Amino acid sequence: MGMSSLKLLKYVLFFFNLLFWICGCCILGFGIYLLIHNNFGVLFHNLPSLTLGNVFVIVGSIIMVVAFLGCMGSIKENKCLLMSFFILLLIILLAEVTLAILLFVYEQKLNEYVAKGLTDSIHRYHSDNSTKAAWDSIQSFLQCCGINGTSDWTSGPPASCPSDRKVEGCYAKARLWFHSNFLYIGIITICVCVIEVLGMSFALTLNCQIDKTSQTIGL
């Protein structure tokens, strides 16, 4: 009974982490694609690392490393790797909770910081081709103009702005999109946390099962 339970747990955790690792590869690949083809980061000279591509590359890399430890620890029944996997997942979970709290506490300050970065980038629109391309992409995609409206463009709105003079600003449009999709974002976040907790539970259970099996066969 002990050996069959051990095998079941081992393969469940292995395939769980294999799927986790594949997801990490996809996220990393998408992040690299964004870094190559997406130039929105030029809008934030005050926070140059604030790009979706950088975030996806970092998250994808971390997921791949953690999932690799989980795969190797489960298939080799290595308690050291399993505990490393557990600790890393725990750190990631705590980091996510901390980040959520910080975003909630400093939401206003972050909004001001982002708004300042966008305001500075508007002044570079006619002198920097990358900034121009980024703004044109955002305004065309969101059907918005400037940060708060057409008045942000002192020399007149560019061609990428919608023709409607009462069009919304891109900052308000982006915030509206976020709030309208808040439920889905919340569900995805909760699912990720549940998966992490399940991974930690599987790792601990397998670790305990290895001990029990070792004692049973007299190792």
Swiss-Prot record:
It holds the Pfam family Tetraspanin. The keyword Cell membrane applies. One of its GO terms (biological process) is positive regulation of myoblast fusion. One of its GO terms (molecular function) is protein-membrane adaptor activity. SUPFAM superfamilies: Tetraspanin. Residues 33-54, 107-181 are extracellular. Glycans are attached at residues 129, 148. Its main location: membrane. B-cells, monocytes, macrophages, neutrophils, single (CD4 or CD8) positive thymocytes and peripheral T-cells. Structural component of specialized membrane microdomains known as tetraspanin-enriched microdomains (TERMs), which act as platforms for receptor clustering and signaling. Participates thereby in diverse biological functions such as cell signal transduction, adhesion, migration and protein trafficking. Plays a role in the activation of monocytes and B-cells. Acts as an essential regulator of B-cell development by promoting interleukin-7 receptor/IL7R signaling. Also promotes, in B-cells, the BCR signaling by recruiting PKC to the plasma membrane in order to phosphorylate its substrates. This is Leukocyte surface antigen CD53. It comes from Homo sapiens (Human). The gene is CD53.
